[in-house]
Amino acid sequence: MAHFLETQEPLVFSGKKRNDRDDEDGDALVAKKSALAVCDADPAAAIANIRHEFGEHGGVNMSIEASATFTVMEPDTMRRMFTGELGPDNDFYVYSRHFNPTVLNLSRQMAALEGTQAAYCTSSGMSAISSVMLQLCSSGGHVVAASTLYGGTHALLSHFLPRTCNITTSFVDITDHGAVANAIVEGRTQVLYFESVANPTLTVADIPELSRMAHEKGVTVVVDNTFAPMVLSPAKLGADVVVHSISKFISGGADIIAGAVCGSENLVKEMMDLRGGSLMLLGPTMNAKVAFELSERIPHLGLRMREHSHRAQVYAERMRDLGMKVIYPGLETHPQHKLFKGMVNRDYGYGGLLSIDMETEEKANKLMAYLQNATQFGFMAVSLGYYETLMSCSGSSTSSELDPSQKEAAGISPGLVRMSVGYVGTLEQKWTQFEKAFLRM
């Protein structure tokens, strides 16, 4: 695996212009696009190093390829595309469920962001997760997963996959490496799945050690990095596949639903195979117009994450000083603070999420009501990564798919408030609003 990581480089393809049919055979195979290394220790630098796509008429922004289907100049070209001889790496496209130039550009950005060879962008985060699991696991297969996960993912693993595909999951405390090792059944377990920073407890996974353990037993490591884009780079730390809900921090506008699968070039090719690829056959296709919107936001993701993280750090420290039970990886009291500090990319802080344990749902709801309706500190809403602060009581919302015993095992108390810290207004202005609401408690 170490050798694989050393040679893993995102692919950046050069452009191709189609001319008329007199140019060679009319649909001439332009020399296969060269791969240019864009790996960089800093994700922002890696994103900046990929080729900038200009518009069709020289616009500084790329054009939106809104076509569902694509024409060819010669009949034989169609056959060559369906046999795999020609494809997107040569700038040949068939149908936008397969590949689309605008979506492919966003995929290149996502690969650069995560430091992987390739990526494929999907219609939602859950479609990315489910497609990966269905590709990597066969009927009768076994998964080991963290007990603390987003509720939708937990439901997929604990209910949907066993019922429809006979794929079972053992849930374990991801910080208990002995339990993880014991849960892996060599020769049967196919995937180790966890979140880089757990939703909603903000437990931090030891990605390098967990990856080492899994690879020793031939298990593929899949990491959901939705909570920590820019902050953590799981693939560089040993993970094989990184999944995202792009709807969150990467979008930043709470207006788009999207996802991504980031991994090796071989994985993406397998998932897009005409006969056996989960992405190809399930069709969780991203709209080109959505891809264009997102591609315009990724260049300033680093700036946004720095401010999310900065404010979350300040708020967490001040909440702690008020005597609140606050959970944030940037606090030295966090159980995995040193671990997280050793894994993060420099200058992006510890992430834009914090959690407050109010002990009971009644107290949690009371605080959130004051914060929204009395002082306008933030909004009661699920999701995260928005420029306004979003807050929800996880046990009764995004983790409601878990039963009481599962919530207890995951460390989700009835009064746990997950807070995605925004950056509108001044820091002191927003803190004053928080303090006023807290004092009313």
From Swiss-Prot:
Q: Where is this region: Disordered?
A: 1-25
Modified residue annotations for N6-(pyridoxal phosphate)lysine = K248
Which molecular function GO terms apply here? Answer: methionine gamma-lyase activity; pyridoxal phosphate binding
Q: Which Gene3D superfamilies does this entry report, sorted A to Z?
A: Aspartate Aminotransferase, domain 1, Type I PLP-dependent aspartate aminotransferase-like (Major domain)
Q: What induces this one?
A: By sulfate deprivation and high methionine levels. Up-regulated by drought.
What cofactor requirement does the entry state? pyridoxal 5'-phosphate
State if Lyase is listed as a keyword. Answer: yes
Q: Highest taxon of the source?
A: Eukaryota
The cellular component terms of Gene Ontology attached to this UniProt record, alphabetical and capped at eight, are: cytosol
Kindly list the biological process annotations in GO that this record carries: cellular response to sulfate starvation; cellular response to water deprivation; methionine catabolic process via 2-oxobutanoate; protein homotetramerization; transsulfuration
Q: Which SUPFAM superfamilies match?
A: PLP-dependent transferases
Reaction(s) catalysed by this chain's protein: L-methionine + H2O = methanethiol + 2-oxobutanoate + NH4(+)
Q: Main location per UniProt?
A: cytoplasm
The EC code for this enzyme is 4.4.1.11
As recorded in UniProt, coiled-coil segments are none
Q: Name one Pfam family in it.
A: Cys_Met_Meta_PP
Sorted alphabetically, the keyword list is: Cytoplasm, Lyase, Pyridoxal phosphate
Knockout or disruption consequences:
Increased leaves, flowers and seeds methionine content, and leaf and root S-methylmethionine content under conditions of sulfate starvation. Reduced MGL-mediated isoleucine biosynthesis from methionine.
Q: How does it assemble?
A: Homotetramer.
The entry's family comment says: Belongs to the trans-sulfuration enzymes family.
UniProt function note: Catalyzes the degradation of L-methionine to alpha-ketobutyrate, methanethiol and ammonia. Exhibits a high activity toward L-methionine, L-ethionine, L-homocysteine and seleno-L-methionine, but not L-cysteine. Involved in an alternative cysteine biosynthesis pathway to the reverse trans-sulfuration pathway (methionine->homocysteine->cystathionine->cysteine) in which methanethiol is an intermediate. Also mediates an alternative isoleucine biosynthesis pathway in which 2-ketobutyrate is an intermediate.
Q: What is this protein called?
A: Methionine gamma-lyase
Per the UniProt record, the source organism is Arabidopsis thaliana (Mouse-ear cress)
Gene encoding the protein:
MGL
